[in-house]
């Protein structure tokens, strides 16, 4: 840990907390909010949600209740829809959702994904070697490889990562082409 660097953190909340605040504003403080995702860190991140489950835990709950996922009719998410947020699960996805250019010649943003890279970047930042740079640090290599993901049967945790990435990109492109920006903004206002 490097608590002496806490004054260098951007004064923003995580996307999970930001969405919790939007939902509380819209549905009221009595709404029960549950985060479902691949990240174990979300379980301890905030008291602004009521519970956090990993995809693996959700899959176990579904199996324990003997629910057959293939018999469930797919449905859209409740509004507000994610739009560009659909690419968040990819490595560098947060920057893409913010439409931040990662061109190494035009921006001063360094992305470090994975525990070893995270630690190395933090150490170099602490030593002053990365002066003037913003760090985007992830202990994982994107949500699609998070520790709470449900693995494909008989595969390693990192197997199928490019297939997963391609599916997310395809989904995000569909969502963006269907997004009514005026309706989306009106919902948030």
Indicate residue ranges for each PLM-predicted region.
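Iron-sulfur-associated redox domains of electron-transfer enzymes in respiratory
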Residues: 1-188
